[in-house]
């Protein structure tokens, strides 16, 4: 399964993140998919700090240990919270606009990367896929490659938080 890196012209989420970061305003991001119902996300929600996150996300961040991979990191809110806790995190996203914003916001290790890229390597004690992180699977037929990729990147005894 090869998910291409996005171009700015085909990156509405990255554009919304960049606009909100630059101007402090963006209304809602509408998400359409044949796999689930239409959804709306207030862009401001992507810029939450730790105390504004739901209890379940807070607990996942607290329980994250060792070398952490934040998949589909978006604006970097989870990575920033982890850094503030003194944890080591690598944030990846297929959106160049999102990665640029993460770096400007202070995420120390943010890179433009496709989770499914066989050349992407590393050994992570925790893999985070919060919010709609499992959406990268796209369809049931992609579950085997998804689990293969998790197994390849997850250190022995590691955990995945979704």
Task: Outline where the language-model segments fall.
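Conserved SAM/SAH-binding beta-strand->alpha-helix loop
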Residues: 95-96
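Conserved SAM/SAH-binding loop
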Residues: 75
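Short alpha-helix immediately C-terminal to the canonical SAM-binding loop
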Residues: 99-100
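N-terminal auxiliary segments of SAM/dcSAM-dependent transferases
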Residues: 1-30
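A short SAM/SAH-binding and catalytic strip from SAM-dependent methyltransferases
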Residues: 124-144
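A short glycine-rich, Lys/Arg-flanked "PGG" loop and its adjoining helix->strand segment in the class I
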Residues: 142-156
């Amino acid at each position: 399964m090869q998910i291409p890196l996005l171009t700015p012209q085909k990156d509405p989420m990255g554009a919304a993140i960049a606009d909100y970061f630059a101007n402090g305003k963006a209304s809602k991001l509408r998400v359409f998919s044949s796999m689930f119902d239409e959804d709306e996300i207030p862009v401001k929600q992507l810029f939450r700090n730790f105390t504004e996150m739901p209890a379940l996300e807070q607990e996942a961040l607290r329980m994250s240990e060792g070398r952490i991979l934040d998949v589909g990191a978006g604006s970097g809110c989870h990575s920033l919270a982890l850094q503030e806790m003194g944890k080591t995190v690598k944030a990846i996203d297929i959106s160049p606009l999102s990665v640029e914003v993460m770096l400007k916001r202070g995420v120390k290790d943010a890179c433009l990367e496709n989770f499914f890229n066989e050349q992407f390597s590393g050994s992570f004690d925790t893999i985070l896929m919060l919010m709609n992180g499992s959406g990268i699977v796209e369809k049931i037929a992609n579950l085997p490659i998804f689990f293969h990729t998790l197994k390849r990147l997850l250190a022995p005894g590691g955990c995945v938080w979704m």
